[in-house]
Amino acid sequence: LTVEDLIRLTMRTGEMAVEIIKQLDDANTSVYDNPSPHTVNVNIKKGPFIIISGHDLKDLEMLLKQTEGTGINIYTHGEMLPSHGYAGLKKYPHLIGNFGGAWQDQQKEFDNLPGCIIMTTNCLMRPRDSYKDRIYSTNVVGWEGVKHIEKKSDGEKDFSPVIRQALELGGFKEDIEPHNILVGFGHEAVLSNAQSIVDAVKSGAIRHFFLVAGCDGAKPGRNYYTEFVKQTPSDSIVLTLACGKFRFNDLDLGEIGGL
C-alpha cells in the first residue's frame, strides 16, 4: 500500500467511526432525550447503595426501576458518569451521584466497600478478595468467580440478588459534604447556546477552545492533562470526554458569561 492508500483507509475509518457514534447517539437520545447540563455529587451519602459502571444505559435504567422504593442509592462509576445528563435517567431521585474516578483506581476504591458493584462493560480489573463477593458482571464482561447477571428471553435482567445483598451490607454510615461537578454538555446542549458562544468569541471573552479527550492510563505520575487544564487561560472553554476526564473534571474553572 502507498502512503496515499493508507491515508484514504484512515479517512474511511474515521468516517465509519463518526457514523457509528451517530447511531449510538441516536439510540440513546431517542430513548432518554438529549443530554443537558446537570450537576453531579461525587461524594457519598448515608445508606445502602449499588455502584454501576460501564457504558450500558439500558442496564442502568433497569436497575433504577428495580430499586425504586427500596431505599437503595445508585451511584454511577467510570464511563457511566455522563448518564446523569439524560432526562430519562436523572428523573430518578435515587440516582444520587458518581463514585470514584477512572477505571485504574477501582481496586483501591472498591476495597472493603459496604455495598455492591455492577460492571456492565469493559474496564473490569481483577477483583480483590475484599470485594469479590459483592461485585457482579453482566453482558460480555466477566471474571472467574464473579457472579454474572444474564439477560432473560424478553431482554430484561433480574438484579434482585444485587439488591438483596446491598440491603444486607447496609451501605455507608454517614454523609460526606456534597461536592458537585458538571456533566451533560453534548452537541445539542452546546448548539443550544451557540449564539451566546459566538457573541462571547466576537467580544473577546472567549479566545480559546480546548477539547481534552482520550482514555487514561494507570501509570502513576501521568498528570500532564491535569496540569495542562490548570494552566489554561481564563478566556478558555474546556470540553472533555472519555476516562481522561477524571484527571481534571473536579477542578473549578469558573464561568464565562454564564457558560
What positions do the PLM features span?
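Metallocofactor- and cofactor-centric catalytic cores in central/energy metabolism, strongly enriched
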Residues: L1-L259
